[in-house]
Amino acid sequence: MTGFSLGKLAIVKRGKHVGVPCVVVGKDSNGRWLVVDGNLMPVIRPKRKNPRHLRQTRLVLKEVAQRITEGKMLDNGWLRAQLLSASVTEELLFKEAEETAWRKMM
């Protein structure tokens, strides 16, 4: 359960939204993380997810985290744009790490 923080980019591992990138926007009293993606999981109705059902990434969306801590509202369209750019970055980082690991094996 450690490692998650506000603005952290995560990928859903279980449930009907498998594979969907989302952003952690909070935590409820039961230890579940509140995640949004601006589309299937809108800002006004964040999805409660068990931390075991989320795959952590290395990216933190600092603008999202800053807005949350300052108490500013998040906009679904803006959030989708942030997620899209972060998802592309994460995919590139993952491919780079995978290629590096492959080279080390050879």
Task: Provide a role label for each language-model segment.
Residues 15-18:
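Short, charged beta-turn/beta-strand-edge "cap" motif at the junction between a beta-strand
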